[in-house]
């Protein structure tokens, strides 16, 4: 857990959690950790970020949907309840962005693995966060970048890039 001060003087709380289970593809946070998570986010902060390995919602284009954490519904409810703004994850190596219950859920690709899905190419996410917006950009090392989504934090409205839905097609390889 980190307490940081951002560029615009925003206070930031970042909590990272190990969701892995030995020898299993599925993950879990576990009810025994919920009170600890709640406590970490109890201090006032302008921005609250939660990071974990597994994703909390199924990722399109990844086949089997069994690789969310076992307690994903409870975890999403908890994170919404404690005012988390952003969840970061990446188990399936496929970038995607959702807005669920005022929580921006951002799944990342990978630049360090060859375990890619379909035509998804190596990438990582860049998040630019201000008091008004959260802009998510996919960066493709050495080959460019693509705007993924823009969250208006005042209206809590997500504006995803309509081309993102086609990222599983071969045409998505052009930045």
Model-based region annotation:
Residues 60-135:
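Conserved beta-sheet core of the metallophosphoesterase superfamily
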Residues 1-8, 96-100:
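Short acidic-hydrophobic surface loop/beta-edge motif
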Residues 44-61:
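Short acidic, glycine-rich surface-loop motifs adjacent to enzyme active sites
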Residues 4-48, 65-74:
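Binuclear metal-dependent hydrolase catalytic cores centered on His/Asp/Glu-rich metal-binding motifs
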Residues 129-175:
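A short C-terminal boundary segment appended to hydrolase-like catalytic domains
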Residues 1, 14-16, 124-126:
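Conserved hydrophobic/aromatic beta-strand scaffold that supports enzyme active sites
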Residues 19, 51-55, 91-92:
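Short, well-ordered beta-to-alpha junction loops that form the rim of enzyme active sites
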